[in-house]
């Protein structure tokens, strides 16, 4: 499979709705993005897709009361916004999407995100498949934003650390980029109060 074909396949997979949401978005990223280059290829471009395939997961799963939403902004990007509360042992809000099957991104060096920040630090979160099963732990890499500025952050695969329920995973297993199933954004680390992150595009780079 050549590079362009593999990227189109990856884009189609990450554009597939979770089974609970409905059927596949058939035409998402079916052609190479006009801004793609030999060194960077688009996985998700919110200027030409919706947020229907994404789901919110906040600290309510452990008794917290943080709130968040993900919606499309009129200017053509996804807006992840809400309020983080530290009450009831909470302290995080997240949004994520999952492919129908693992995506092989091993020919690239890492992920690139184009975001509109608010001065807070966010986490790009990945989950992978190992031995045919989804790992219990996730892989996380952080990026510190500048308030009111569009910026692009490149996160090498080596920047991602394995984490389970906020703790480092024993043995520090390396990220396996040839079997990525889930990807998402999170705000955590005791950053209480309102937050606002615009997401324009997610790419892979070499």
Regions found by a protein language model. Name each.
Residues 2, 6, 19-206:
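Beta-rich carbohydrate-recognition modules and glycan-binding surfaces
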Residues 9-19:
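Bacterial N-terminal signal peptides
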């Amino acid at each position: 499979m050549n590079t362009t074909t593999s990227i189109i396949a990856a884009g189609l997979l990450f554009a597939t709705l979770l089974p609970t949401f409905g059927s596949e978005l058939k035409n998402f990223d079916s052609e190479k993005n006009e801004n793609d280059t030999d060194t960077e290829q688009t996985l998700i471009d919110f200027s030409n897709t919706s947020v229907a395939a994404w789901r919110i997961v906040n600290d309510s799963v452990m008794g917290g009361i943080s709130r968040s939403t993900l919606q499309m902004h009129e200017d053509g990007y996804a807006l992840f916004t809400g309020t983080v509360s530290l009450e009831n042992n909470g302290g995080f809000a997240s949004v994520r999407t999952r492919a129908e099957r693992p995506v092989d991104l091993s020919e690239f060096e890492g992920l690139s995100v184009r975001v509109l920040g608010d001065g807070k630090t966010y986490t790009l979160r990945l989950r992978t498949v190992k031995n045919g099963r989804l790992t219990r732990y996730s892989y996380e890499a952080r990026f510190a934003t500048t308030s009111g500025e569009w910026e692009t952050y490149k996160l090498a695969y080596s920047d991602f650390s394995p984490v389970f329920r906020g703790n480092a995973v024993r043995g520090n297993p390396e990220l396996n980029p040839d079997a990525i199933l889930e990807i998402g954004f999170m705000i955590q680390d005791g950053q209480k109060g309102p937050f606002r992150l615009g997401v324009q595009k997610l790419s892979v780079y070499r």
